[in-house]
Amino acid sequence: VGPARVVVIGGGVVGTHAARIAAGMGADVTVLDRSLPRLRYLDDIYGGTFKTSYASAGNTIELAREADMIIGAVLIPGAAAPKLISRAQLSELKPGAVLVDVAIDQGGCFETSKATTHQDPIYEVDGIMHYCVANMPGAVARTSTIALGNATMPFMLALADKGWKKACADDPHLKA
């Protein structure tokens, strides 16, 4: 049996971590993104760990047809997630394929996505399994809270030490 084929749509933080985990488990992983600089960065940093490709509509469905799992990890700040796979396109996917919609908090990136819970996380549409749990980090609340604290503490300390104006002027992450 060959490795699972995983397509990750979105090469941001969430998509990159999903790709790393899947590749680490032996999957054949392709990350799709619309940012050429981001794709170059992923190739430079993770070269060989997983493949990257530009996320055109045609390329997305072409790769999705062969995938065992498709992870939707797209984010457009301040906007609803784009619908990347339509209900009609489900029939083109492998029977039993799994859609994981990490963008469900922004409305979902698959037309057939609907928010689920940790207690009842999966459902099936036309032979395709869906996992669309909102607030996925809630499954490991203590760990995710500690991680969030560790990630945000340097910013809080800078704000406390410098005041908001100077901290924002000094740090491009706070400025954004």
List where the protein language model places each region:
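Glycine-rich phosphate/diphosphate-binding loop of Rossmann-like nucleotide-binding domains
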Residues: 1-75
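General structural feature for long, well-ordered alpha-helical segments within catalytic domains
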Residues: 5, 14, 18, 34, ...
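Alpha-helix termini
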Residues: 23, 28, 39, 81, ...
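Rossmann-like adenosine-cofactor binding region
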Residues: 47-126
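Adenosine-phosphate binding glycine-rich loop
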Residues: 104, 108-176
